[in-house]
Each structure stands twice: as structure tokens, then as C-alpha cells.
Curated annotation (Swiss-Prot):
GO cellular component, one term: cytoplasm
Pathway the protein contributes to: Glycan biosynthesis; sucrose metabolism
Organism whose genome encodes this protein: Staphylococcus xylosus
Annotated InterPro entries: ConA-like_dom_sf, GH32_Enzymes, Glyco_hydro_32, Glyco_hydro_32_AS, Glyco_hydro_32_C, Glyco_hydro_32_N, Glyco_hydro_beta-prop_sf, Suc6P_hydrolase
Keywords: Carbohydrate metabolism, Glycosidase, Hydrolase
Protein name: Sucrose-6-phosphate hydrolase
Superkingdom field: Bacteria
Lineage, broadest ranks: Bacteria, Bacillati, Bacillota, Bacilli, Bacillales
Length: 494
């Protein structure tokens, strides 16, 4: 793919003729990798989820969007509306780069309710004549007719002294009638940080200081912060950049994770345990959370990473969002489970019960490209158990469980075309308890694996041939007694 010029990357969607848009749309629609039950861009590139909220009977889900190709360029917010987080209606581009402050992109932010109206707080990105970045924080209000009206000027016009222009991704939450914004930042020592602001009227924001953690030197930038209380635990989510890999940990180019403990919002001190990754697969970044209509904490992430090329780029589009996950804390541990509403996509239930051994078994009539597969491990005497999905004579996506180490490994070395550059073709995680259950959500070009009822999650894009539809199981030695439940998933291409 030819290199994009600066002029091409910062061309406005509104300035492109309809014929060009139709040509792009036709190219994308012909892609063999299009998903069926994930939010994906109609054309161009999707990245961070933005502005997630349940408001007056509807869910609103937005994402970063560059319309004109599978590269990072002039960013818009593209918004969807839903009643159930399964079926989505496209509203279209809602927050657009149409002022001087956001001339080079409307960057990530969050949604919140204030005086019975929906508001968004976001980062405006501007470049001066020397291409220096200028980051400011803005607010926009959604009117009753759905139109978006920006406040006339920035509510935070510059980062505080001691911090660089890497100052973005405001996440707003309210506590005791006070509005707080957590903002991703970088100090002048090139260390990632989170800054806290407060407001009582959402116009005037007071800088309170830097959130104090024990992660003093933990990457050169922290992106996409999120803060909430879950079952009595304070959770601080962020995405550190510049972390070296440690064995099986931190192998992706950038990380997404959390620290859990107790946060003193007045003194800005976080007493916390270790940083943990939210997802142990290949393709997960920039997660954001919100409360659903029942008060459950829901997480949606970007199923992709910056600075990596994906095979779908050749078809004029890139990336998708993950399925929504419900977060809970159980016995002091974070659990992530797929939302129950996804069950409405299920059709054609099939079940099987039996032993797997060292002779590979093709599970007939189990096959498919878009399905949910639940594997219950009822007895396990095998040293290693192997599960393969999207298999053909030449391709396979392999999940391995090592009983002695309680180690689960996702291997996409034979999954077809691979994103690049990516470190290695496997990702692994060590489970807290022996493997008893796997729940897989497989779409045309992705797999999301929930282990032990939400103990771990592994997410990956796979760019497999459309004829790779088989499902297999076997062991290294010994046998395991398994129950399989499979559903075809029927989603309307979003």
C-alpha cells in the first residue's frame, strides 16, 4: 500500500465527491473479512470507542473514525444508537473537525449526563505551521433533535505546567454532585500520567493534580484512562505505551490494563495492587466502560492496535470494536463476561458429549465462520488439550491448554494472513484455576475467548480463508471428557 501524504490524511470527508465515497464503499463491501456482529467502519479506519452511555432509553456508542482509508488521519466521531447493545442503528459522523481547535482531528473522549442532557467531553487536536501539536479539551451538547452543539471555546485550554502536549482522552464521572475528568498525560520527563480536574458547572474546570500511583516509571505515555468503583473496589484503567515485555506479559506493542484498590479522590492517592492486563490476546486497546440500564458496568474495547498493518487494509477498511463485556469483582478478582443480550443472535443449537484423545477429531457437523462455541471440560487427564477453529487443510486457529502449568495459549501462526509487525504468533496466560470452561465468539475475522466464566479473555483478529470452517479437538497424551455446545450467530452486518 502506497504511503499516504499529509494532505491526503487531513482531507475532510465533506470535501470528497460522492463518486469517490461510493467507490470506497463498494471496495469495502467486497472484502471477505467483513464482520457480522461487531461494530466496524463502513469505510476507512475505526479506532478508540468514545462517548459510551445509556441515556433516556438508548445506548450511544461512538468511535474514532478516519473515513477515507485504513490509516490514521483526520479523525471524526462516528456514532451508533441501540436499545440492547446487539442491534445498532448508525447515526453517522456526529462530532466533526470543523473549528480551528480541532482542525487536525476530534480525538477521544467520554459521555456524561448533566441537567437532563447528554454531553460529550473530548480532545481537540490542532497543528500549528511548524506541525507542533496543540491539545485542548472541549465539551459538546446533544440537543433533543440529536444535533451536536460545541461549546464556543475550550474548557481546558492547555496542559498544566510540567506536562507535554500529549494531553488527551478525558473520561468524566460524577461523585456527590461534582464532575471529575481524568485526562491522559505525559510529563516533561516523558513518563505517562493521569491528571484529575473537577467542576461543578461543567464549564469551569479546576486542575487538582496528578493521580498518585506506585507506577512511577511505567511507560512514556498513558492513554485512555477510566475510573469507577466496582463492588467496593476502585478501578483505574489506562493504556501504557513503552512497556517492555516480561515473559508472557506485555507482548503487544501497547498495553491495556488496570490497577485495583482504594482511591482517595480528594488527595489523589491510589493504594493499589499490581497492574493487570485486561485482555491476553493480540488485538485489544483503548477500552472504555459505562453503566447499562440495570447498573451493570459494561466494557467495550477497540479490537486492534496502533502502528500495525492489518490484511483488511488492502480492502479500504480497518478494525472493529469488541463485543460488550460485563465487569464484576468476585473474591477480589475481576471477571469479564459477554453481555447476556448476545444470546438473541443464537440459532441452530448443536451439542456433543465425548472424549478427546491424541487422535485429532473433526467435530461433525460442527463448522462455521460466525458462531458461539461453549466447551465444558468435565474431566481432564490429558497433559495438553487442543482446540482448533476455522480449520481447513492448510489453516487453523489453535487454542492449547497445558494442565500442569494451567497455561492457555492462543496460536494464530496458521490462521491465514497475519497483521504486522507483531511480536510472535502466540499469546499465553496462566489461569488461577484449572480450565473448566471456554466460551468462544467467532466472527468472520475475529475470535474472542472467555476462559473459566470470565477469569481471562483473549481477543484476536484472524484473517482466514473463507473455506476454513472446521472445528477440531485432540490431546497430547491422555484423554479429556468434553461437552460442546455450538450456536450459529446471525448478526446483521453493522
Amino acid at each position: 500500500m502506497s504511503e499516504w501524504t499529509k494532505e491526503q490524511r487531513y482531507q475532510k470527508y465533506e470535501d470528497v465527491d460522492q463518486q469517490t465515497i461510493e467507490k470506497l464503499t463498494e471496495q469495502v463491501n467486497q472484502s471477505e473479512y467483513r464482520q457480522t456482529f461487531h461494530i466496524q467502519p463502513q469505510i476507512g479506519l475505526l479506532n478508540d470507542p468514545n462517548g459510551l452511555i445509556y441515556f433516556k432509553g438508548n445506548y450511544y456508542v461512538s468511535h474514532q473514525w478516519f473515513p477515507l482509508g485504513p490509516v490514521h488521519g483526520l479523525k471524526y466521531w462516528y456514532t451508533y444508537q441501540s436499545k440492547d447493545l446487539v442491534d445498532f442503528k448508525a447515526i453517522g459522523p456526529t462530532i466533526k473537525p470543523d473549528t480551528k481547535d480541532d482542525s487536525h482531528g476530534v480525538y477521544s473522549g467520554s459521555a456524561f449526563e448533566y441537567h437532563d442532557h447528554l454531553y460529550y467531553m473530548y480532545t481537540a487536536n490542532h497543528r500549528d505551521s511548524d506541525w507542533n501539536r496543540i491539545s485542548t479539551q472541549h465539551i459538546a451538547k446533544m440537543s433533543k433533535d440529536g444535533s451536536i452543539n460545541k461549546f464556543p471555546k475550550a474548557v481546558i485550554s492547555a496542559p498544566p505546567s510540567g506536562y507535554t502536549q500529549h494531553f488527551r482522552d478525558p473520561k468524566v464521572h460524577v461523585q456527590d454532585g461534582v464532575y471529575y475528568a481524568m485526562i491522559a498525560a505525559q510529563n516533561i520527563k516523558k513518563q505517562g500520567r493521569i491528571l484529575q480536574y473537577r467542576s461543578t458547572d461543567i464549564v469551569n474546570w479546576e486542575f487538582q493534580g496528578e493521580v498518585q500511583t506506585n507506577l512511577d516509571d511505567f511507560g512514556y505515555m498513558w492513554e485512555c484512562p477510566d475510573y469507577f468503583n466496582l463492588n467496593g473496589y476502585d478501578m483505574l484503567l489506562f493504556c501504557p505505551q513503552g512497556i517492555d515485555s516480561e515473559g508472557e506479559r506485555f507482548k503487544n506493542i501497547y498495553q491495556s490494563g488496570y490497577i485495583m484498590g482504594q482511591y482517595d479522590i480528594n488527595n489523589l492517592t491510589m493504594n493499589h495492587a499490581d497492574f493487570h492486563e485486561l485482555d491476553y490476546g493480540f488485538d485489544f486497546y483503548a477500552p472504555q466502560t459505562f453503566l447499562d440500564e440495570n447498573g451493570q458496568r459494561i466494557l467495550i474495547g477497540w479490537m486492534g492496535l496502533p502502528d500495525i498493518n492489518y490484511p483488511s487494509d488492502a480492502d479500504g477498511w480497518a478494525h472493529c470494536l469488541t463485543i460488550p463485556r460485563v465487569l464484576t469483582i468476585e473474591s477480589g478478582n475481576l471477571k469479564q463476561r459477554p453481555i447476556k443480550a448476545l444470546e438473541k443472535l443464537r440459532t441452530n443449537e448443536e451439542t456433543a458429549l465425548g472424549y478427546a484423545n491424541k487422535f485429532t477429531r473433526q467435530l461433525h457437523p460442527y463448522e462455521g465462520k460466525q458462531f458461539e462455541l461453549i466447551i465444558d471440560i468435565l474431566e481432564n487427564e490429558a497433559t495438553e488439550v487442543y482446540f482448533e477453529v476455522r480449520t481447513s487443510k492448510t489453516e487453523s486457529t489453535l487454542i492449547t491448554y497445558n494442565k500442569r502449568e494451567q497455561k492457555l495459549t492462543l496460536d494464530r501462526s496458521e490462521s491465514g494472513q497475519l497483521p504486522e509487525p507483531v511480536e510472535g504468533t502466540t499469546r499465553s496466560t496462566y489461569l488461577d484455576t484449572p480450565l473448566s470452561k471456554l466460551q468462544l465468539f467467532v466472527d468472520t475475522s475475529s475470535v474472542e475467548i472467555f476462559c473459566n466464566d470470565g477469569e481471562r479473555v483473549m481477543t484476536a483478529r484472524i484473517f482466514t480463508d473463507e473455506n476454513a470452517t472446521g472445528i477440531k479437538t485432540s490431546t497430547e497424551s491422555g484423554q479429556t471428557y468434553l461437552k460442546f455446545t455450538k450456536y450459529d450467530l446471525k448478526g446483521d452486518t453493522i
